[in-house]
Regions:
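Extended active-site neighborhood of metal-dependent phosphoesterases/phosphodiesterases
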Residues: 1-63, 68, 102-103, 129, ...
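Short, solvent-exposed loop/turn segments at secondary-structure boundaries
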Residues: 6-8, 48-53, 87-92, 146-150
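Short acidic, glycine-rich surface-loop motifs adjacent to enzyme active sites
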Residues: 70-85
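Histidine-centered divalent metal-coordination motifs
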Residues: 1, 79, 116-118
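Active-site-proximal beta-strand elements of phosphoester/diester hydrolases
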Residues: 34-44, 75-79, 133-140
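Conserved beta-sheet core of the metallophosphoesterase superfamily
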Residues: 89-163
Length: 190
């Protein structure tokens, strides 16, 4: 996505660099016997904050796991958030987020990976008690775009999928040691 000051590119070719450098397909699927990971685009040149989910993206979520192994952990990857994280109250959500979250639940998604906020946070989130999806927000890994306490702090999440558990380890970069170090661990039943 081009920055707001490159208005023409942002409005008329917002994902040109992404498609050229990373991937043409804006809704890729990667799967094996244990995991099915579906990406859905929430970034559009006409939105300034929060992104959006249209009926087209909802259909990608609904049908994106067709053919996935029955026991495979279903993971949805989006840039913008689909649910508010209590610890980060007041942050932007994608337009159409609630419907997208419901659609993800109906599709059997158990883990949503997202970014946008440049803050590391992992928590189960549900629209109703007992129906939660784990939301893992990644901090910034390769820039200084963090916010608040995460400003200029680099993070990433290491995810391990086991037969009965999902393990997410948050790692933070220690510049004085030139390495990433685990700072928090989360384990969830599948």
């Amino acid at each position: 996505m081009y920055p707001w000051w490159r208005l023409f590119s942002r409005l008329f070719a917002p994902l040109r660099r992404y498609k050229r450098i990373i991937e043409e397909d804006l809704a890729p699927l990667w799967q094996n016997a244990d995991v099915a990971v579906k990406g859905v685009n929430t970034a559009f040149g006409w939105t300034v904050q929060g992104g959006r989910i249209t009926e087209h993206e909802l259909e990608q979520i609904r049908t994106g796991y067709d053919g996935a192994a029955g026991e495979a952990l279903r993971v949805l990857v989006v840039h913008h958030h689909l649910a508010e994280l209590i610890a980060l109250a007041g942050h932007d959500l994608a337009r159409g987020a609630e419907k997208a979250f419901e659609t993800a639940q109906q599709a059997g998604v158990k883990l949503i990976l997202c970014g946008h906020l440049h803050i590391a946070h992992i928590a189960p989130v549900g629209l109703h008690p007992g129906d939660g999806i784990i939301v893992a927000t990644a901090g910034t890994c390769t820039s200084n775009r963090g916010r608040g306490k995460d400003k200029a702090v680099n993070h990433f999440n290491l995810i391990s999928v086991e037969a009965t558990d999902l393990h997410i380890e948050e790692r933070v970069y220690l510049p004085e040691e030139s390495r990433f170090e685990p700072v928090a661990e989360h384990r969830f039943e599948r």
